Amino acid sequence: LAGGMLAWSRFYHPVIVYADEKLKMIQINRLAKGCLSYAVISEGKGMIIDPGKEIEVYLELAGEHRFEIEHVVDSHLHADHITGGPRLAEQVGATYYLSSEEAKGTHLKYEPLDRHDRIKVGDVQVEVLSIPTPGHTPGSTSFLIDNRFLLSGDTIFVGGLGRPDLGGKAKEWAEDLYHTVFFKLKDLPDDCLVLPAHYSDIREMNDRGVVGELLGKIRENNEIMRNEDKASFTEQVAGAASMEKPPNFEEIVAINRGELQVDEERAIELEIGPNRCAVHHHGSHEEEA
């Protein structure tokens, strides 16, 4: 591979998830990390969700697909990779959004997601499920488009649920995750396509290279999402989450909170390694997103 590991870590592969005359959705796959970001495009306007630190990828995408980046969003405070959100928003003059729960105590310049029920992108309304969808981190947020596409951040993966223990409160956050699964997301239709922020296995891609799955299939294949007994669910999730944390996650979180600045070499070092942001479960292949 020309450029070796460095080039591989910076390689992003965009795939069109959906396109009609009103809406285009692109999934941008950072293969070395299993990180997924998204462009939601309508009428020449765009929203970028969960961008990686290589912001030129999104600038090139905007040029290629002829849209102006108006909104940049992080679904949560990432623990496994460095966000490009604030830098991208600053460079293009877009609004940067983050949950106020996630941004608490930081000096980030942001618009609180929890102030918005919807964000308009061209002719499309992006519904902000700042329900919020906690459980992974307390301010995790999901985004629903046309009741057909759920951009789930790290709350629901193709093969697992978000890890609730990265804040050291596994049991409390597992209870939040229970509420998310069985109340906040309960009424979403089975044919809603879940598009997560991570994946860990190439089997999670479909034949077009898109990582995503119908919510009904995830419910069907994911035993833990059918366990409506709160005590049992909480114990199972909290227990499954007691595993190794993402490498360097405290330093990465500090960078994403705007408390620490590092050079590119250190940033690359910090991001090397697998993602560990999902709960292991039974009923489908293991997830380590």
Where are these predicted regions, by residue range?
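Accessory terminal helices/loops
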Residues: L6-Y18, H179-A289
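Catalytic core of the metallo-beta-lactamase
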Residues: V15-E70, H107-P196, H280-E288
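Short, polar loop motifs at secondary-structure junctions
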Residues: L98-G105
